[in-house]
C-alpha cells in the first residue's frame, strides 16, 4: 500500500518530502545540541522529530512505515546531523533558524500526511469493495496534523520539555488551517495538486510567522479557583 502512494505522487512531492524530513531532523538535532547530547543522542532526536509523525500515521493506516521501505529517509536524518556539525553556529544559534526549519517541516508534513491518508484509505476501500470510497475530510486533516506534530511531541518529551503543541503557540491549529485550505481549494474546483499543495504549505508558514511576530496564541486554560487564589495572594503581599 505504501508503494501505491509513492507511485501516485510526482517528483516534486518527493523532493518536498525529503526537504521536510531534512528540516525536521535539523530542528531536532539543533535542540539536542543545546541540551549537550552526544552524536548518537542527537541523531535519535533528529530521527524521531523527522519520522515520528509519519510513523504513527502509517501505523494507524495499517501500512508499513515509509522509512522502512525507503532507507533514504534514514540517511536524510543522518545528513542533518552532519550539517549541524559542519555549520553548527548557523544552525544552533538563533530562534529564527529553528523557526524556519521547524515550520518548513510541519508545513510539508501536514499536507503530505493529508494526501497520503486520502490515497491509502480510498485505495483500501476500493480493495474491500466498499460502495463509499471517499475519505472523510476531517479524518485526512487529523492524520495530517498527527504527521506534522507528533514527531515534535516525541522530540520535546525526549529532551525533557513541555511539547510545543501543548503551549500557547499556534502550532497544531496552523496545520489544521492549512489542511482546511487544501480542502477549500479542492471543493472550489482547483484541480491542480501543485497549487493546492504549495498554497497550503505557504498558508501554514504564514500563520506561524504571524503568530511569532505578533505573539498570537491560544489562551492558557486555568481554573477559576486558581485565579482567585493568586488574586488573594497578591492582595496579601500588597
Indicate residue ranges for each PLM-predicted region:
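C-terminal ends of transmembrane helices
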Residues: 25-35, 58-59, 82-95, 153-164, ...
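Alpha-helical transmembrane segments in multi-pass membrane proteins
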Residues: 24, 45-53, 72, 76-80, ...
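Cytoplasmic-side transmembrane-helix entry/capping segments in multi-pass membrane proteins
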Residues: 40-48, 69-75, 95-106, 139, ...
Amino acid at each position: 500500500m505504501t508503494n501505491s502512494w509513492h507511485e501516485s505522487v510526482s517528483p516534486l512531492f518527493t523532493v518536498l518530502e525529503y526537504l521536510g524530513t531534512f528540516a525536521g531532523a535539523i530542528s531536532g538535532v539543533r535542540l539536542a545540541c543545546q541540551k549537550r547530547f552526544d552524536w548518537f543522542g542527537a541523531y535519535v532526536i533528529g530521527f524521531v522529530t523527522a519520522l515520528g509523525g509519519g510513523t504513527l500515521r502509517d501505523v494507524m493506516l495499517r501500512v508499513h512505515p515509509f522509512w522502512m521501505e525507503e532507507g533514504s529517509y534514514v540517511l536524510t536524518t543522518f545528513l542533518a546531523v552532519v550539517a549541524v556539525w559542519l555549520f553548527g553556529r548557523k544552525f544552533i544559534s538563533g530562534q529564527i533558524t529553528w523557526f524556519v526549519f521547524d515550520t518548513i517541516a510541519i508545513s510539508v508534513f501536514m499536507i503530505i500526511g493529508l494526501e497520503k491518508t486520502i490515497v491509502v484509505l480510498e485505495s483500501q476501500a476500493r480493495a474491500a469493495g466498499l460502495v463509499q470510497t471517499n475519505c472523510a475530510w476531517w479524518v485526512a486533516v487529523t492524520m495530517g496534523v498527527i504527521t506534522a506534530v507528533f514527531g515534535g511531541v516525541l522530540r520535546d518529551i525526549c529532551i525533557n520539555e513541555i511539547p510545543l503543541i501543548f503551549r500557547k503557540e499556534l502550532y497544531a491549529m496552523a496545520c489544521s488551517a492549512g489542511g482546511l485550505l487544501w480542502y477549500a481549494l479542492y471543493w472550489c474546483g482547483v484541480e491542480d495538486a501543485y497549487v493546492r499543495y504549495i498554497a497550503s504549505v505557504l498558508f501554514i508558514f504564514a500563520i506561524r510567522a504571524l503568530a511569532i511576530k505578533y505573539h498570537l496564541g491560544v489562551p492558557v486554560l486555568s481554573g477559576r479557583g486558581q485565579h482567585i487564589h493568586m488574586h488573594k495572594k497578591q492582595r496579601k503581599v500588597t
